């Protein structure tokens, strides 16, 4: 199954010093092709179920990625079903940040991309799966109302 969605909203300003990606860092990720081949997992745990095949920035500057989920594995098949059913509706970008300590201040250094995650509800606003295509099928576009959990009153993570 192929998936496309927003894995990170538009980046922060160049003067930002924090844990989120700056816009220029997102541009570098795309330019250098660093998302290509990054593992796709579920809910910040578990086995790899696929890989990122492409990435781009949309007109708002948000990081988009195209992922291929391996449906020949049990885990990949289940995750694909969760996407089709709206149970896994969001994406999360997993990365580490090298935080430097000096003069009683913290400075965010290099960010290392680790994984893209299919999640029930992402931590960042607007990071949704927007479309998928099962093997041999047509493209299915998702809308925020497709969230299977929306009928339940769920606590915020």
Q: Residue spans of the language-model regions?
A:
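Residue microenvironments linked to proteolytic maturation
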Residues: 5, 12, 55-151
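Intrinsically disordered, low-complexity segments enriched in polar/charged residues with Gly/Pro
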Residues: 26-28, 40-43, 67-69, 103
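Short conserved beta-strand and strand-loop elements enriched in small hydrophobics
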Residues: 34-47, 91
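A glycine-rich, hydrophobic loop/mini-helix early in the fold
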Residues: 41-60
């Amino acid at each position: 199954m192929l998936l496309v969605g927003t894995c990170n909203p538009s980046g922060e300003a160049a003067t930002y010093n924090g844990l989120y990606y700056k816009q220029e860092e997102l541009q570098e990720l795309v330019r250098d092709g660093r998302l290509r081949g990054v593992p796709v997992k579920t809910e910040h745990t578990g086995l790899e179920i696929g890989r990122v095949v492409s990435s781009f920035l949309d007109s708002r500057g948000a990081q988009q990625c195209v992922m291929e989920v391996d449906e020949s594995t049990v885990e990949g098949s289940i995750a694909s079903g969760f996407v089709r059913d709206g149970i896994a509706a969001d994406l999360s970008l997993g990365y580490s940040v090298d935080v430097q300590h000096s003069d009683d201040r913290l400075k965010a250094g290099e960010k290392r991309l680790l994984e893209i995650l299919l999640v029930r509800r992402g931590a960042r606003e607007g990071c949704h799966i927007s479309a998928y295509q099962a093997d041999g099928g047509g493209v299915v576009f998702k809308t925020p109302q497709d969230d299977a959990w929306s009928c339940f009153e769920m606590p915020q993570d």
